[in-house]
Each structure stands twice: as C-alpha cells, then as structure tokens.
Amino acid sequence: WNSLGLADSSVMDTPNIDRVGREGVYFRNAFCTTTLCSPSRASILGGLYAHSHGVVNNFTEYPVDLPTFPRQLQKAGYQTAYIGKYHMGEKNDDKRPGFDYFVTHQGQGKYFDNVFCFNGGERKMVKGYYTHAITKMAVDWVKNRDDDRPFLLYMGHKAPHSFYYPEPKYEHAFDDVDIRYPLTAFHLEDNPDWYKARLDTWHGIYGPIFDYRKEFPDRRAQSVLDFANMVRAYRGTIKSVDDSVGYMYEFLKSIGELDNTMIIYTTDNGLLEGEHG
C-alpha cells in the first residue's frame, strides 16, 4: 500500500491511481483477510472467507457451485469479461463460469511476450509488455461490446508480482532513490526461532530475494544493494500499472462512459519490502 502516491508514499508517483481514489472513495484501512494470492482472489470473487470457499493454497480452483459476483451480474444482463492473470488452478486456463469473454494463461505468466488462452480455446503469444497487452485487449473488448447493455470488465494485472521486470521506460526510474532495509526488519525479539530462520530463505531479506541475490544467505552490510535493486524493479512495474489505469480512465471518458462506470482498483495482497524480516 505504501507504493502509491495516494498512501503518502515519499518515493512513488502514481497520479492515475491517485485520481481514482481522490475522485471516489479511498479505503485507507482496508485489509486482506488471507494474504496468499489464490485464497484472496477467491474471496474477492465470491465475498467469502477462505475457510468458507475452500481455496486455501495457490493451486485450488474456485468451487463451481459457489456464487460469484460476475455470475450474478451476468444473470442480471451484464456483459462480462475477464482479461489477464486469474491464478486459481495453476495449470488451468479454461474459461470460467460467469464470464462471456475470458482471456488468461497458466500460472503466473510472463512480463514480456506472454501466451494467452482465449475463451478456453486458442492459445497464442501476444507480443510486448504484459501490462500494455491486457490494457489493449480490454479496450478492444469494450469497443466491441453491445452498447445497449451494461458491462463488467475485470482486469488482472501480472505486475507487480515477482519476478520483477519493468518495461524499458521505467527500468531505471528509481536508480537514484536510496533504499535501505526497513528498521522493523530486525525487530524480531518476540518471534519464535523458526520465524527468525526464515530470514535466510526465499522470502527473507538475507535470501535470494527473487533472484536479485545470486549467493545467499548473505548477511553482509553491502548485500542491501541487492535488496535495493529488487525494490527499484518492483516499483518500476507499478508505474506501468498506473499508466494502464490512466489509459482506461481516459478511454472511458472519450466514449462517454466515465461517469457511468464504477472503477474499482484493488489487489489480492501486498508485498513486504523487508518489514519484519
């Protein structure tokens, strides 16, 4: 959350996301009930806690017998589309219930030249940067919809998920920003030993940090440089998402639908930038 200008970030400038929040409602104290990706996505889809919908890991499908808000809108006459990363059922890119148009891919997808599956049928590589690719597909779908019916467009960005690959435009956007380990990274006295041991593992600040550190664990003072490069790349990917939000905003405005459209910007979870180890 602190990588948004709207959240009083001292280093991030996200004017388009900020505009949505300032012109609408900004939930400053909203919290994710289950911080793992797929369980959280399932909760957004169906409005249930993880212990109710049963998606408790990143490999489980959302149960087809449970309701979802897209299915309800579809029943009410809405045109519905999902475009982007779905991430429930790791190897499944089939079309899901509740969507008239469904474009996704298996697993996490790739930042560049990703292979998408269209409506559970044809798979093809879409050249270019993921964020811009799904934005263009979203615009094309809205242009070709039935103007006489309301619509739901659900976009699933890959960014800013690891591994972090900013587009060239933002690859060096934060090179001059000083980044250090947060102070809370070392406030571990009240935590059990197994927790402290995780500092040297995949998600710990002394671990590989998404491949930005080649030799690990590394507790040397200079290893903070690897951490800093990871955070800079992470923030670079966010800038592209902000551009996408701005493009969709201006597009809706250009076709006269901005004031007739509810724009919801949310996420399945957030990244700890070294906080609490």
Task: Indicate residue ranges for each PLM-predicted region.
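Formylglycine-dependent sulfatase
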Residues: 1-277
